[in-house]
């Protein structure tokens, strides 16, 4: 019998994401991606910019090139929490694909 740990679902925010940098999360890839769990490293959080009543920033995550994700919305499962992000590939190397999620929060 397999027991799945219960993780708290959180809304991604700068305050929530900052402590998670450098850690790993996984996503469940869709059938279009080939299926399976894909490990992602939360790599970089940009400096937030305040404009038009909102703060905007981006989160860069890195995954293996042999398990490339199609652009879309994914649930990232971190050991401490889960959250939804829209991921888009922005760069590809021999071994890794870099994805970015663009986020905004009201001031």
List PLM regions with ranges.
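Surface-exposed, beta-sheet-biased, low-hydrophobicity segments with strongly acidic/polar composition
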Residues: 1-107
């Amino acid at each position: 019998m397999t027991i799945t740990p219960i993780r708290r679902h959180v809304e991604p925010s700068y305050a929530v994401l900052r402590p998670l940098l450098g850690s790993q999360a996984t996503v469940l890839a869709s059938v279009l991606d080939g299926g399976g769990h894909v490990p992602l490293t939360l790599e970089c959080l940009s400096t937030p910019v305040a404009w038009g009543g909102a703060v905007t920033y981006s989160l860069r995550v890195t995954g293996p090139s042999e398990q490339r994700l199609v652009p879309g919305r994914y649930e990232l499962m971190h050991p401490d929490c889960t959250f939804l992000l829209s991921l888009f590939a922005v760069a590809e190397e021999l071994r890794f694909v870099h994805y970015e999620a663009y986020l905004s929060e009201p001031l």
